[in-house]
A protein has these predicted regions:
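Short glycine-/small-residue-rich Rossmann-like dinucleotide-binding loops
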Residues: 60-61, 86, 212, 218-220, ...
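Rossmann-fold NAD(P) dinucleotide-binding segment
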Residues: 65-76, 223-242, 253
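Phosphate-binding beta-alpha-beta segment of Rossmann-like dinucleotide-binding domains, i.e.
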Residues: 101-158, 173
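Rossmann-like dinucleotide-binding domain for NAD(H)/NADP(H)
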Residues: 106, 230, 239-320
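Short beta->alpha connector loops at strand-helix junctions that form conserved
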Residues: 84, 104-111, 204-205, 294
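A short, aliphatic-rich alpha-helical micro-motif
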Residues: 47-51, 72-75, 154, 207-211, ...
Length: 320
């Protein structure tokens, strides 16, 4: 039986991270691959490249917009597109065109969600045990920092999740063995639904003001931009920990920085405004801040898992 054709659009130097030898073999096991993934520029005739293709594998959003609605309509055979690693902006625009051409689009980017959730759990554990702070103290010459009674553990903490979508729910799942209380806010999630993953739904004001650890998991939309206000930030408990692997646009970033400078709470952050932050940004000097350079969802293993997850979704849709 003739195997279905799968078109892999260009993503340039990212290609081997998602489509390594193992994943390429996995895809070739059930399909004929039309592979433009390593290209840095759009192919000269995208419609020609799509001839006879039944499905698109979109490794990330770098070249997604090369595939236009007109090209898809001209070809007429593409019926499925699976996203390996969703890039907001480029994918949002591209998939609107794909859907308009009658293509069914599936987001299979769970690998990225898993990576961010694991980073978040690691940040929480780092924060309660003050790993980074103690490391800095010992490197600075403190022979044996006495922090026995300032370090803590997750057990007994109230953890507030702001955003209960994919990542928020994964974080809630990872926290289950730790004997924590989990509260959460999401405008589009009901209290009944939240309870199914052991989260007690609370208003945003309550989550921000009463949690020992706050973790942000909202996407950036017109509704969520600066949703977390100065009042919310100033209500955070003294000494609490805020973890941000989402985006800075969802909070009042100026108020966030001011409160950190005053030492009102602690933060572990993977996102900044702008990115990267200037080398002389005072945030880099705050002792109550731990920073990573936007890597929560960008690891070598994450790329492999994203590729694998999308390929297996394609297999399911194309051959059952």
């Amino acid at each position: 039986m003739e195997r279905p054709k799968v078109y892999v659009h260009r993503v340039g130097s990212w290609a081997p991270r998602y489509l390594d030898d193992e994943n390429r073999s996995r895809l070739a096991d059930f399909s004929e691959i039309v592979d433009d993934s390593s290209l840095d520029a759009p192919p000269s005739n995208i419609a020609h490249r799509l001839e006879g293709v039944q499905a698109i594998l979109s490794l990330n959003g770098a070249g997604a917009e090369d595939i236009t609605e007109d090209a898809l309509r001209a070809v007429g055979t593409v019926r499925i597109a699976v996203i390996s690693h969703w890039f907001h902006g480029s994918h949002d625009r591209a998939t609107a065109a794909w859907r308009a051409a009658g293509v069914r689009v599936t987001d299979a980017s769970w690998g990225n969600n898993f990576a961010v959730a694991q980073w978040t759990l690691g940040a929480m554990i780092n924060g309660v045990f003050r790993v980074a702070e103690l490391d800095r103290a010992m490197r600075a010459g403190e022979v044996w920092p006495d922090h026995h009674f300032t370090s803590s553990m997750l057990d007994g903490q109230r953890i507030g999740l702001v955003g209960l979508g994919r990542i928020g729910r994964l974080v809630a799942g990872l926290l289950q063995p730790f004997h924590v209380e989990i509260v959460g806010y999401d405008k589009y999630v009901t209290a009944e639904e939240a309870s199914k993953f052991n989260v007690r739904w609370c208003p945003l004001e309550q989550v921000m003001a009463t949690s020992d650890i706050i973790s942000l998991h909202l996407p950036v939309t017109p509704e969520t931009t600066r949703l977390i206000t100065r009042a919310h930030i100033e209500s955070i408990r003294k000494g609490a920990l805020l973890v941000n692997s989402a985006r800075t646009a969802i909070l009042d970033y100026e108020a966030f920085r001011e409160c950190l400078q005053k030492g009102l709470f602690r933060a572990i952050v993977d996102v900044f405004e702008p990115e990267p932050p200037p080398v002389d940004d005072p945030l880099r000097t705050f002792p109550n801040v731990v920073m990573t350079p936007h890597i929560a969802g960008s690891t070598a293993r994450m790329c492999h898992v994203c590729g694998r997850t999308a390929i297996e979704e394609l297999r399911k849709q194309l051959v059952g």
